[in-house]
């Protein structure tokens, strides 16, 4: 009799453990949204440019931007995302999204530049990036 009750109790505890393990407060079936963003450089004229960036999907918690940097001065392949992210982390300025800034100083006409931005998740890890290369337009000394 005692053995039978012990087996029934053990079976009951086992079932409870299975139910508890399969139920959690996290909804694992919910689709995970990968953060994405864009960056656009426009209105390139007269030694100025307009840089804009916004979050397209997902959620981020801060960003860093390099507004413009001469492509000729970059010593790595900026098409490799890991290298570009590291470069922006080390040299970028903290910003918030959406981001808009009109560059009115420092551009040299005819120079190819890169603009890049990265965004961070809640843990402070870079989760998305965007960049654009472009050529400054204007007149020397303006």
Give residue ranges: language-model regions.
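Bacterial Sec-dependent N-terminal signal peptides
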Residues: 17-47, 133-141
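Beta-strand-rich modules
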Residues: 104-127
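Conserved aromatic anchor
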Residues: 47-60
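Recognizes extended acidic, P/S/T-rich segments that occur
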Residues: 65-108
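Sec-dependent bacterial lipoprotein signal peptides
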Residues: 1-21
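Beta-strand acidic-aromatic groove motif in beta-rich domains, primarily in extracellular
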Residues: 62-66, 129
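Beta-strand secondary-structure signal
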Residues: 38, 50-52, 114-116
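Repeat-associated, polar segments at repeat-unit boundaries in modular proteins
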Residues: 119-121, 129-138
């Amino acid at each position: 009799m005692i053995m039978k009750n012990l087996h029934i109790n053990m079976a009951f505890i086992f079932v409870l453990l299975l139910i508890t393990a399969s139920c959690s407060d996290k909804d694992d079936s919910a689709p995970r949204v990968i953060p994405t963003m864009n960056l656009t450089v426009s209105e390139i004229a007269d030694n100025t440019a307009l840089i804009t960036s916004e979050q397209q999907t997902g959620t981020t918690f801060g960003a860093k931007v390099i507004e413009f940097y001469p492509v000729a001065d970059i010593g790595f392949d900026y098409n490799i995302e890991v290298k570009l992210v590291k470069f922006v982390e080390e040299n970028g300025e903290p910003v918030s999204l959406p981001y808009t800034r009109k560059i009115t100083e420092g551009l040299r006409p005819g120079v190819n530049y890169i603009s890049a931005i990265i965004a961070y998740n809640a843990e402070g890890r870079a989760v998305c990036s965007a960049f654009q290369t472009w050529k400054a337009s204007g007149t020397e000394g303006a």
